[in-house]
């Protein structure tokens, strides 16, 4: 497996405890909300004041903005707002020295025909990537995607070596019509990053590895078999369950 990150889903003092205990990276979610990016210096100065020591010499991932945005929108003003926010978040990632940034797929199959979604999204991503170098990996994450074939086709058409898929296994468990095994076999080496958590298949509750109906270890074995060493973020909202999940990953990796 590749690099391991913990998502900053609980108070900073608890994140600090985990990062002091384990040699892992941090996925920052603070810049995923638009009003943070509206602050002076896109919120970086304020974040550094609180967390400068926490992130020093640490692998970082940024969760990009997602609320009210849409890469596939027919409305040019919405697409431009999305482009602005994505560029702001990318700039934050660059200045913090992040390894990667994660953006949602924005696919709603009850709204968009597949071909329309792919064409609109492709236009957006081609514009976004014009001035991006290879220093940051960009991952497109499944959210409400029912059929992951659509995301596969989009990534293939973008055809960039810095673009890959972030497979969120919790989202897939709740919203996809396909099993995780089918999805992993379908996407294969296109999976560059993982969001790992568990749920009951009904609500995206971000539970720990042992608190849901996903067999996380079996899923990771499929990842080992069909993918190319993706990085992963443990995206669990409960502190104790997050610690337990990290321990499970560490024990598995040390076998």
Model region roles, listed by residue range:
Residues 15-23, 41-62, 88-96, 129-133, ...:
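Acidic (Asp/Glu)-rich catalytic clusters
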Residues 72-164:
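Active-site acidic/histidine proton-transfer and metal-coordination neighborhood
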Residues 35-36, 68-73, 108-113, 174-175, ...:
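A short acidic, helix-capping loop that chelates divalent metal ions and anchors anionic groups
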Residues 41-47, 78-86, 115-125, 177-186, ...:
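Charged helix-capping and loop-helix junction motifs
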Residues 7-11, 29-33, 65-67, 106-108, ...:
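Active-site beta-loop-alpha junctions enriched in small/polar residues
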Residues 2, 16-18, 148-156, 160-164, ...:
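Histidine-acidic metal/acid-base catalytic patches
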Residues 1-64, 68-88, 255:
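N-terminal pre-domain/capping segments
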Residues 2-8, 24-28, 60-63, 101-103, ...:
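Hydrophobic faces of well-ordered beta-strands that scaffold small-molecule active sites
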């Amino acid at each position: 497996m590749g690099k391991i990150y913990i998502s900053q889903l609980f108070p900073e003092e608890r994140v600090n405890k985990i990062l002091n205990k384990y040699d892992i990276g941090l996925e920052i979610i603070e810049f995923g909300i638009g009003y943070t990016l509206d602050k002076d210096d896109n919120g970086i100065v304020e974040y550094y004041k609180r967390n400068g020591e926490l992130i020093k010499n640490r692998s970082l991932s940024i969760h990009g903005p997602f609320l009210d945005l849409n890469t596939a929108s027919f409305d040019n003003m919405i697409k431009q707002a999305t482009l602005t926010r994505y560029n702001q978040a990318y700039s934050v990632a660059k200045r913090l020295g992040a390894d990667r940034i994660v953006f949602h797929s924005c696919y709603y199959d009850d709204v968009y025909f597949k071909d329309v979604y792919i064409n609109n999204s492709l236009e957006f991503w081609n514009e976004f990537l014009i001035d991006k170098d290879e220093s940051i990996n960009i991952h497109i994450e499944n959210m409400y995607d029912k059929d992951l074939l659509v995301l596969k086709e989009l990534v293939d058409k973008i055809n960039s070596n810095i673009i890959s898929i972030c497979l969120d296994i919790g989202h897939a468990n709740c919203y996809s019509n396909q099993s995780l095994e089918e999805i992993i076999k379908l996407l294969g080496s296109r999976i560059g990053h993982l969001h790992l958590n568990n749920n009951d298949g009904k609500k995206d509750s971000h539970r720990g590895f042992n608190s849901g109906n996903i067999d996380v270890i079996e899923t990771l074995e499929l990842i080992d078999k069909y993918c190319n060493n993706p990085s992963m973020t443990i995206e669990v909202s409960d502190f104790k369950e997050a610690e337990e999940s990290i321990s499970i990953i560490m024990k598995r990796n040390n076998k």
